[in-house]
Amino acid sequence: DGRVARITSTASDFGKEYDSLADVIAFGVAPALVIYEWGLNAVGRPGWLIAFIFVAAAALRLARFNVQPTRDSRYFQGLPCPMAAAVVAAGIWVADNQAIQGGSAIAVGMVATLMLALAMVSTLPYRSFKDLDVRGRVPFAALLLVVFVFVLISFDPPWVMFFITSAYFLSGPLLWL
């Protein structure tokens, strides 16, 4: 991972590109294949095209991230690929857990996948949380919040993860307003 390479002072240009290739596969190709197999394949070529658009958007997002200088490290420009992949995974998890299927579920999946692709290549601001310092003393309230989130997740993991990932996805347009 790029962050580990920077911490250990082993970063290189090759490593940066290799890391991006791994990210395209993990956060672009894999979720696109998952949502395609989940339901987009039922609509034929449009489903294949939407899955391809998701992969292309992830690749473009990562390429832009590699070449553009950081303006404000507190924000990403566009939805980060791992979060787009997490929204796909959480959405499918909820749909599978609730036995949601059929034409309307596939239509929602198609629209959501396109919206995620657009968010990745957009210039919408998304919090990076890089300004949070967790190396020093962490306030007690922050620890309580972490415990609360884990307890909340334990009640209904699919829905809680879907809510958290969707809230982050929607935060970009809300920060833009």
What are these regions (language model features)?
Residues 1-6, 53-67, 107-126:
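Hydrophobic, membrane-facing alpha-helical anchors
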Residues 2-5, 9, 46, 60, ...:
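Generic preference for well-ordered secondary structure
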Residues 3, 7-65:
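Multi-pass membrane catalytic core of lipid/isoprenoid biosynthesis enzymes
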Residues 7-15, 39-46, 67-73, 98-100, ...:
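Short juxtamembrane and helix-loop transition motifs at transmembrane-helix boundaries
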Residues 47-91:
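Hydrophobic, well-structured mid-protein blocks that either form specific transmembrane helices
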Residues 73-177:
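C-terminal membrane-associated helical module and adjoining short loops/tails
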